[in-house]
Amino acid sequence: MANIQFRPLHDRVVVRRVESENKTAGGIIIPDTAKEKPQEGEIIAVGNGALDDNGKRVPLEVKTGDRILFGKWSGTEVKINGEDLLIMKESDIMGILG
């Protein structure tokens, strides 16, 4: 895992997509053009948390290294250090795997 020089703000996280299998269970190879973008990823950076109505910081439930599931249209695609990543709010994350 490369060390990125980027820290998201508030309740945002930086996610690296986890690539899916190139082959089906039956052995059929799926070409890149037919693949959907994976909705699974690994968190590589987290913000400090959002502020509540009283100005108190609310820490994030996810941490660096967590494997997550997120919605199909979640996040903003960015390129950091030549790597395609997603920046999304913690609320866009559906759950933590494992």
Swiss-Prot record:
Protein keywords: Chaperone, Cytoplasm
Cellular compartment(s): Cytoplasm
GO BP field: chaperone cofactor-dependent protein refolding
InterPro entries named in the record: Chaperonin_GroES, Chaperonin_GroES_sf, Chaprnonin_Cpn10_CS, GroES-like_sf
PROSITE patterns: CHAPERONINS_CPN10
Similarity comment: Belongs to the GroES chaperonin family.
HAMAP family named in the record: CH10
PANTHER family listed in its UniProt record: 10 KDA HEAT SHOCK PROTEIN (PTHR10772), CO-CHAPERONIN GROES (PTHR10772:SF58)
Function: Together with the chaperonin GroEL, plays an essential role in assisting protein folding. The GroEL-GroES system forms a nano-cage that allows encapsulation of the non-native substrate proteins and provides a physical environment optimized to promote and accelerate protein folding. GroES binds to the apical surface of the GroEL ring, thereby capping the opening of the GroEL channel.
Record-given protein name: Co-chaperonin GroES
Organism in which the protein naturally occurs: Bartonella quintana (strain Toulouse) (Rochalimaea quintana)
Taxonomic placement: Bacteria, Pseudomonadati, Pseudomonadota, Alphaproteobacteria, Hyphomicrobiales
Recorded name of the encoding gene: groES
